[in-house]
């Protein structure tokens, strides 16, 4: 099989921009994203026309990651890394980083670094990344923000001479390419005007000086041989008892501009469990479609607070379904929708569903005290899920003893994280079902 990972020496180095261009350059690409991010996969899908899947060692486990990677392979798999190559949950080398994942899957790494303010010393940088964990196959480098072809030739000679790593090309310094990273930080793919035109400009600029033939050769020859046929790949055995367990049942999934953060593997796993899926819009629809359960994913409800609050018939329908004992799973933005209300940064409150007894207060900065990977434990201290928190809001006026589950960090820090009433699980954590099947069994 053909595959490679594009990883950077740090965040903001240009790997997303270059990943997008490379995904547009090959045919029938299987796009993947390391970690829990929702935004980048949306751009992957827009570019390739194929679903993009997250590969997260913490939330999915080794078996889950392996399944997803093999099952969804098409002509060539391109994995976009996260943060710096070796950055993970701690400073070990088995830390769920991009390097850890590449090593586990046996795929070559193409390292992205920038050429600003460097000369021969750029080789030392590459050598350091190569030698930190020799088990990681750094098979090539692409240099971003290069001032000229002559400068690149200096970089190339030094890197190949002192490290043995092949230089695959460079991206010229071009401030106009920054538009993509700016959009990626704020908007989803469907919200960017003239995205096709912008991507074509990006593709032309980035691929002008990259050796695609050599890159494809590396992807073909240096990916560890996989014996299994993709069609034979099955879900991990520990998930097999859930196959068709809910046949005949329907789950209604919120999907619109306010709620769009879903892992493709999660949706497919609901179908594997037997659920029929019906989508609805809490912004535009009058009621929840006929169903046995409701799934409210993450997104940006704060940006549509007026519309959501004003759609009182939908709010009443959500409440009615809850009172009827329907199961409700609500993650982050979906949880905010179930709260008593969302208070914006100016102090204005928009009333929501009033099922989770708290008020959500928007802020202008990431809540770093409630950020990152967590294990979710029940009242007996048993882990029922693995998740990730990332939010710019905090809770106010929380009624005590209404949250029955704790978020536990690797360093021992913990906090109450999920509101639980009747058949409702609502909280900030985003979960991947491969590592959270116990929660699903309790809920459904």
Label every model-predicted segment.
Residues 5, 78-80, 110-112, 142, ...:
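Structural motif
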Residues 18:
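Hydrophobic positions on the alpha1 helix immediately C-terminal to the Walker A/P-loop
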Residues 120-239:
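Internal gly/pro-rich beta-alpha loop/helix module
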Residues 102, 206-209, 244-247, 259-269, ...:
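C-terminal and late-domain segments of enzyme folds
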Residues 239-243, 247-312, 316-323:
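Phosphate-binding active sites in nucleotide-utilizing proteins
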Residues 3, 28, 248-250, 276, ...:
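Residues that mark the start of a beta-strand
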Residues 277, 301-378:
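Cysteine-nucleophile active-site neighborhood
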Residues 2-13, 24-105, 113-140, 149-153, ...:
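ATP-dependent carboxylate-amine ligase catalytic core
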């Amino acid at each position: 099989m053909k595959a490679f990972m594009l990883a950077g020496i740090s965040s903001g180095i240009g790997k997303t921009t270059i990943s997008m261009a490379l995904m547009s350059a090959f045919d029938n690409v299987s796009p993947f994203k390391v970690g829990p991010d929702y935004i980048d996969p949306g751009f992957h899908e827009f570019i390739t026309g194929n679903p993009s899947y997250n590969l997260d060692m913490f939330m999915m486990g080794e078996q889950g990651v392996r399944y997803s990677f093999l099952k969804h392979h098409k002509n060539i798999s391109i994995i976009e890394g996260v943060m710096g190559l070796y950055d993970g949950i701690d400073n070990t080398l088995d830390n769920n980083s991009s390097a850890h994942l590449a090593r586990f899957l046996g795929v070559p790494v193409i390292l992205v670094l920038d050429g600003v303010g460097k000369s021969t010393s750029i080789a030392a940088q590459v050598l350091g990344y190569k030698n930190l964990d020799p088990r990681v196959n750094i098979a090539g480098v692409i240099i971003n923000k290069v001032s000229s072809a002559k400068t690149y030739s200096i970089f190339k000679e030094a890197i190949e001479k002192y490290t043995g790593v092949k230089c695959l090309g460079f991206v010229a310094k071009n401030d106009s390419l920054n538009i993509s990273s700016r959009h990626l930080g704020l908007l989803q793919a469907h919200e960017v005007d003239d995205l096709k035109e912008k991507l074509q400009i990006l593709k032309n600029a980035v691929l002008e000086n990259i050796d695609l033939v050599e890159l494809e050769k590396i992807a073909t020859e240096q990916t560890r041989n996989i014996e299994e046929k993709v069609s034979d790949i099955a879900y991990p055995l520990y998930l097999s008892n859930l196959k068709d367990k809910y046949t005949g049942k329907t789950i209604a999934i919120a999907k619109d501009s306010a709620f769009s953060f879903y892992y493709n593997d999660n949706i497919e796993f609901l179908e594997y469990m037997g659920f029929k899926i019906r989508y609805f819009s809490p912004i535009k629809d009058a009621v929840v479609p006929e169903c046995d359960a409701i799934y409210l994913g993450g997104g940006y409800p704060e940006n549509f607070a007026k519309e959501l609050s004003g759609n009182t018939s939908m709010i009443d329908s959500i409440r009615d379904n809850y009172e009827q004992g329907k199961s409700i799973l609500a993650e982050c933005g979906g949880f905010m929708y179930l709260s008593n209300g969302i208070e914006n940064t100016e102090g204005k409150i928009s009333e929501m569903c009033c099922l989770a007894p708290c008020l959500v207060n928007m802020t202008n900065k990431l809540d770093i005290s409630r950020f990152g990977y967590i294990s979710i434990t029940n009242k007996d201290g048993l882990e029922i899920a693995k998740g990730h928190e990332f939010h710019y809001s905090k809770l106010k006026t929380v009624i005590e003893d209404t949250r029955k589950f704790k978020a536990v960090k690797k360093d021992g820090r913990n906090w109450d994280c999920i509101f639980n009433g009747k058949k409702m699980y609502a909280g900030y954590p985003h979960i991947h079902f491969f590592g959270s099947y116990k929660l699903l069994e309790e809920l459904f």
